[in-house]
Amino acid sequence: MEIPRKITIGVPQSLAVFGMSENNRREELKHSAMTFGTDGLGLAVGGPLAKGLPHPRSYGAFARILGRYVREQGILSLEEAVYKMTGLAAQKLRLKDRGLIRPGLAADLVIFDPVSITDKATYENPHQYAEGIL
């Protein structure tokens, strides 16, 4: 296919399609079966993992939920959001040893400030860590 090849020469291999309605997203976030996850990559703001223009969610998916939809818009309570990110997600994935803080269970803890947590990554400048994670 000659035409697509000519168009993409020298252009970064990245595409952002905005097809979701923000109103629909708000309703989906509130649904009792909705869990939160991301397909973002493990990246860094410096070194070999700071190349290209990845989707901003690689740096700020969970911070966006906590900052925008919990603190700013009040779509969910903080407790609901954390449960959807942890306990409910583990339950849906049938990870019996994850999702709760309890003796004998595996746990990775993230300490954050609910007053300041904010995603900073953008499509133009995606390599930015979220603020408010201690």
Residue ranges and their predicted role:
Residues 1-9, 26-115:
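His/Asp/Glu-enriched, well-ordered alpha-helical/loop segment
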Residues 16-18, 45:
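Helix-coil boundary/capping segments in enzymes
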Residues 19-23:
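Buried, small/hydrophobic-residue-enriched core segments of structured protein domains
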Residues 116, 121-134:
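Phosphate/diphosphate-binding loops
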